[in-house]
UniProtKB/Swiss-Prot annotation:
Source species taxonomy: Eukaryota, Metazoa, Ecdysozoa, Arthropoda, Hexapoda
Localization, UniProt: Cytoplasm; Nucleus; Cytoplasm, Cytoskeleton, Spindle
One cellular component (GO) term of this entry: cytoplasm
Consequence of gene disruption: RNAi-mediated knockdown is lethal in larval third instar (L3) stage.
Pathway participation: tRNA modification; 5-methoxycarbonylmethyl-2-thiouridine-tRNA biosynthesis
Keyword entries, A-Z: Cytoplasm, Cytoskeleton, Microtubule, Nucleus, Phosphoprotein, tRNA processing
UniProt protein name: Elongator complex protein 4
Name of the encoding gene: Elp4
Organism in which the protein naturally occurs: Drosophila melanogaster
GO BP annotation list: establishment of mitotic spindle asymmetry; regulation of transcription by RNA polymerase II; tRNA wobble uridine modification
Amino acid sequence: MTSFRKRTVQKPIRGTRTSPHTAQVITSSGNPYLDVVIGGGLPMGSICLIEEDRFMTHAKVLAKYFLAEGVISKQEIFLGSLDDIPAEMLRRLPRPLTDQESMEQSEVQALGDAGAENGLRIAWRYNDLPLVNSEHATAKIGHHFNLMEQMDSMMLYNVKTTLWDDSPKHLDIVIDEEFSKSSSPTTPSLEQQPVEDAPPIPGTETAPQEKMPAQEEENSANNNNNNNNNSSSVTSSTKTGSQDSPLQVFHNPRYKGLLNDIQQLLRNESFVAGTKNNLCRVCLTSLGSPLWYDEHFGEDLIKFLTLLMASVRNCNSVCLITMPMHLIAKYDASLVPKIRQLVDYAIELESFAGSERETHPAFKEYSGLLHLHKMSAINTLAVHMPETPDLAFKLRRKKFIIEKFHLPPELQESSAKPDNCISGLLSNSNATASLDF
């Protein structure tokens, strides 16, 4: 017998690939620019936190990218939110670009449209060098989307989606009525009838005068023993029932309902760790908003994130959460580092809208800054870090761009400096001429 075994190559999960740097199975976040910043994509079993800006506009765009990538890759989707309508959010997902459109877009970007707007042209020998905003040059997975157009509704029918908005689940009225009729009949059974109303068993009818006093004493003694046994059984059953009752983990029942729905979906056989059937994308938008507030808000939120991380780690899934961290910091500043400790990636979006930087000439090209607060090493020794932590983002009509933050050239100031110097020299020469002795 030979020990030869034919090597079989298993097909990877749709929309995933093995990272050449860490040998991990990663999937795209939906935005090619964000994929390169975090090392090619999100590792399987990871949680990415997007800290929302004050107006909560840019984080929702990244959430739509995340969901749209799952639809194109035919991965199962779980979307939960209290602030947004999940069904409406799915209808407004961006349309994916075709291969020809993506090639045309890359060609236009290679020509340097930013330089054409400023009236500048780059030398021909530098055309092959990477641009300033070439953070996405090494991206190999994921798709490009057009934010101006919405995705075709037929694409959503081919994907399994689970929506959660804490709305009550109404059962079918017809099924409820039939179940109530079958479970509670109108005519009571013999066991439900009282003893005095139960029909006598034929052949056992006896007159009350024929009973002997000795038999009456025995019956009374037996009844007392039965009553004692029943009372002891009732007390024991109540004790065991109190011991078997589940502990209340959350004070807010919304966390329990959301976590139960997520865990029930992740228990599916297609998401078992080690199998390569499918991947589940869990997206939670505006978690920790004022709609979640109560007396035990901080305690319940920390418990929920802890249990969520344990659930996502043990199956083929990836999670994206958007949270209004600026509101949570006002509620309790100590919650911010705790929340970042319970996620794998913590990315803050600082928008320029409504601030002085919005009108500042140095920031006119950007919509805001991107801060990397946490980058975790999942099953690896080293953490991937981008070339520079100084990143900025642009929200254009058709796409969301993340690039290296740089200041514009000081053309106007440099041209104004020689004039000032010349005028200063002339004034000094006149002053020395007037001081001639």
